[in-house]
Amino acid sequence: MPRGCAGARFACNACLNFLAGLGISEPISPGWAAMERLSGLDAFFLYMETPSQPLNVCCVLELDTSTMPGGYTYGRFHAALEKYVKAAPEFRMKLADTELNLDHPVWVDDDNFQIRHHLRRVAMPAPGGRRELAEICGYIAGLPLDRDRPLWEMWVIEGGARSDTVAVMLKVHHAVVDGVAGANLLSHLCSLQPDAPAPQPVRGTGGGNVLQIAASGLVGFASRPVRLATVVPATVLTLVRTLLRAREGRTMAAPFSAPPTPFNGPLGRLRNIAYTQLDMRDVKRVKDRFGVTINDVVVALCAGALRRFLLEHGVLPEAPLVATVPVSVHDKSDRPGRNQATWMFCRVPSQISDPAQRIRTIAAGNTVAKDHAAAIGPTLLHDWIQFGGSTMFGAAMRILPHISITHSPAYNLILSNVPGPQAQLYFLGCRMDSMFPLGPLLGNAGLNITVMSLNGELGVGIVSCPDLLPDLWGVADGFPEALKELLECSDDQPEGSNHQDS
């Protein structure tokens, strides 16, 4: 279960007296103790959202319905989802806030929760291939979620080329999950057998009235100076260490050092997607031959695919691209919140023509970047964002689009690698054949490439804005070519000694 903010669960008498002076006299109920407050990083994704920047985490599933007990019908699918959601409180929780709340919003149970508000059904146009599926999913990815309800939707897309398949697109707000938490949330709807019984229902965390939300928020707000007293020294120390690293050339790629590309620019409201799938055995073969990590291979695949795409359009930069990469700290952070991540910047050297040299350069650069990110620590970014509010981040979103990025984007793309299950899964009784993760676009970086493994396959999901990149299939189709290129040059490499899986 997600961790709540322990420091915001109890109010002092001074807080209650203050609120009473404002004329608020609702009783304190036991539900307050269970109320879960968003962390600053969770709330960041609410505050930064705009009509042209929906901040949702999505995945597209291709399902074989022949395994569904009793045979597939939309009604059976609806009933199965209803049972499974009862065992996952995260699906039934919505935002709650009040104008008197000085801290971030809270999660409370939706007393009026109904599956029909979240489950959608749509038919795929003929011929029902991957391009038709991508067109529908791109449209869905650009739609905002209703903040008055739990922040998720599921779309069942019927009418594919095969009668025994359906596609499902699950969309969850980034305030609810990060990549790892999203995979965990998805697992609540899966089983290892198609006829596995639905899990037992789990009670939610309850609700919170205006007094409870405001009083606990006042406590959290009042504690910020104490927290700031610890964050500032840690930040100063980090800056000093970074300066020393820079002198020795041991820093990650710097923000605003990225070259201009066609996918850097103002975002529109629409989204388009493309996807592809790779054999994990081939990915691991490259990893072992070069003695690098899976992450290194993923970056090398991106570099190769983007090199091919940019060359075809005559716009390949002479400098390496820069990607911002979310780094999960779920196992390192003791901070509350559902999003447990920090970020690092890594170079994507698409300008290097030799694939062997390219992957070696990537591995060396990633080692430095990960070491630098580890030195910064898993919680420093989280701690600073905790102090921000909707006013500050809203102002940032009004200012950032007017900053010229012609010569120096903060970064070119978002690149994420999410570990996935290595077993055959059944989604509400339907065999899961493929899974393609889709991340959000942020700032003026109009390209997100997210990969996730599933049962021996690596799903690659690509998201952009059609105002910047009207056709993404050139990027998607470059991934198999990039893998083939690495496999061919890896045949001449000795077995690597560094067989890492991360």
From Swiss-Prot:
- Any one GO biological process: response to hypoxia
- Pathway, per UniProt? Glycerolipid metabolism; triacylglycerol biosynthesis
What Enzyme Commission number(s) apply to this enzyme? 2.3.1.20
Concerning Gene3D superfamilies, the annotation shows: Chloramphenicol acetyltransferase-like domain
Alphabetically list the UniProt keywords.
Acyltransferase, Glycerol metabolism, Lipid biosynthesis, Lipid metabolism, Transferase
Entry annotation: catalytic residues? H174 (proton acceptor)
Q: Which reaction is catalysed here?
A: an acyl-CoA + a 1,2-diacyl-sn-glycerol = a triacyl-sn-glycerol + CoA
- InterPro entries linked to this entry: Acyl_transf_WS/DGAT, CAT-like_dom_sf, O-acyltransferase_WSD1-like, O-acyltransferase_WSD1_C, O-acyltransferase_WSD1_N
Per the record, GO CC terms? Answer: plasma membrane
What Gene Ontology molecular-function terms does this entry list?
A: diacylglycerol O-acyltransferase activity
- UniProt keyword Lipid biosynthesis, yes or no: yes
- State the family it belongs to: Belongs to the long-chain O-acyltransferase family.
What is this protein's name?
Putative diacyglycerol O-acyltransferase MT1809
Source organism of this protein record: Mycobacterium tuberculosis (strain CDC 1551 / Oshkosh)
